Regions:
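Small-residue-rich hydrophobic transmembrane alpha-helices
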Residues: 75-134, 172-191, 304-369
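Transmembrane helical elements of multi-pass membrane transporters/channels
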Residues: 42-61, 164, 231-235, 239, ...
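Residue-level recognition of transmembrane alpha-helices
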Residues: 44, 78-81, 125-126, 162-165, ...
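Interhelical loop/hinge segments that connect adjacent transmembrane helices in multipass membrane
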Residues: 2-7, 19-43, 221, 240-281
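Short membrane-interface helical motifs at transmembrane helix boundaries
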Residues: 131-163, 360-377
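Alpha-helical transmembrane segments of multi-pass membrane proteins
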Residues: 152-178, 311-312
């Protein structure tokens, strides 16, 4: 009954829509037909490459601040990012709900409904980012940092970083939203290109803003947040322009710009369970940092945690997340196409690929820990 109501809501809104400015690309039907392993891998490998490159961006940030500012800067980024991650994971759960709808409608070959779901996800992210995350995050940052660290040097480095990330988070959220929508519709190469562009731009800006260049002063730890915000903001603006202009496999519809509460309700219904799960997992990291911050050498301990777990280990986590997104996209499209057995097999296939990759990286970490940690200063 609820699915029928949502379909009626989508169809009613779409009926008044004008044609898109530019024809959208067709969905890749090999995801719901043909061999399964190539279908999963086709979506997974660009996402893995994107996440690995994004992970290297974090490496560069920590290497620069660790060598130019000191270990307290590593701790500051680690503490700030853990706080930011708890909030961003919860908001990003909306995109999981959006991706579920996109995959189902793409599998059923209903592009108008896909585009409506994407647009409502954008509206929800816009409100939560600018209306909730930015103001509350800015004013609560000192209290959150005071809870996690007793080292005044770490807190002083972390406060401007965290405030910048909260206030200018919208570009990053737009990228996360678009990546999830495109992958769920079967296109993971476009997010890869955007992710590489954002990472390269971020690296250049961070190197300049952290250490300074010519008339540009060295901003230290805050420069890392500034570079991330500028790079993600520029990519977010470009993505919005393309969504309005058309030509991607997902676009914004013409007309029907008001919030559709039936769709938004479904976004939360599908996404909130994953959001609460993500919060529970990341709160564990927050409590670990709180305990470390209470120690006599809390700053050094938090710096070690930020590098070892927050950067090195997350290479495995980000790759796993990419495979999770790929399996969700393939499974969702096959459910939409009426292939439940193939959907279940897609999840198992992605799990086996992820297990093999994690084992390989884990062996590398086991034999070369000193060399890997040494590059962070």
């Amino acid at each position: 009954m609820e699915d029928a109501e949502l379909s009626e809501s989508l169809s009613g809104t779409i009926a008044a829509d004008a044609p898109l400015a530019k024809p959208a690309r067709k969905y890749d039907r090999s995801i719901v037909e043909g061999p399964l392993v190539p279908a999963v891998w086709k979506i997974a490998w660009p996402a893995i490459i994107t996440n690995l490159i994004s992970g290297l961006q974090g490496w560069v940030d920590h290497i620069l601040v660790g060598n130019l500012v000191g270990y307290k800067a590593n701790a500051a980024i680690g503490v700030s990012w853990q706080i930011f991650l708890v909030v961003i994971v919860f908001i990003s759960s909306i995109f999981i709900g959006m991706s579920v709808l996109v995959a189902r409608y793409a599998g059923a070959n209903e592009p108008e409904k896909v585009n409506r779901a994407v647009y409502q996800g954008f509206l929800t992210a816009l409100f939560m980012s600018l209306g909730i995350l930015a103001p509350i995050g800015y004013f609560c940052s000192p209290y959150l940092l005071g809870f996690l660290t007793s080292d005044p040097g770490v807190a002083a480095e972390a406060l401007p970083y965290l405030r910048i990330m909260f206030v200018f988070s919208f570009g990053m959220l737009i990228y996360f939203m678009l990546s999830g929508a495109l992958r769920s519709a079967g296109d993971s190469k476009t997010p890869m290109v955007l992710g590489i562009a954002m990472t390269v731009l971020n690296l250049v800006l961070n190197i300049i803003l952290i250490r300074g260049l010519g008339p540009i002063p060295a901003f230290g730890t805050a420069g890392s947040a500034m570079g991330t915000s500028i790079a993600s903001g520029l990519v977010g603006i470009y993505a919005l322009w393309r969504l309005v202009r058309g030509g991607w496999v997902v676009t914004f519809p013409k007309g029907g710009y008001a919030p559709d509460w039936k769709i938004i309700k479904r976004l939360f219904k599908f996404g909130l369970p994953a959001g609460f799960q993500g919060i529970a997992m990341n709160v564990g990291g927050v409590m670990m940092l709180w305990f470390m911050g209470s120690l006599a050498q809390g700053g050094a301990a938090q710096a070690a945690y930020a590098v070892a777990y927050g950067q090195l280990f997350l290479l495995i986590s980000w790759s796993s997340n990419a495979l999770m997104g790929a399996s969700a996209a393939v499974a969702g499209q096959n459910l939409g196409a009426g292939n439940p057995d193939r959907a279940k097999a897609a999840v198992n296939t992605a799990a086996m690929i992820g297990l093999s990759g994690a084992a390989f990286v884990g062996i590398f970490f086991f034999f070369f820990p000193t060399q890997l940690l040494g590059i962070f200063g």
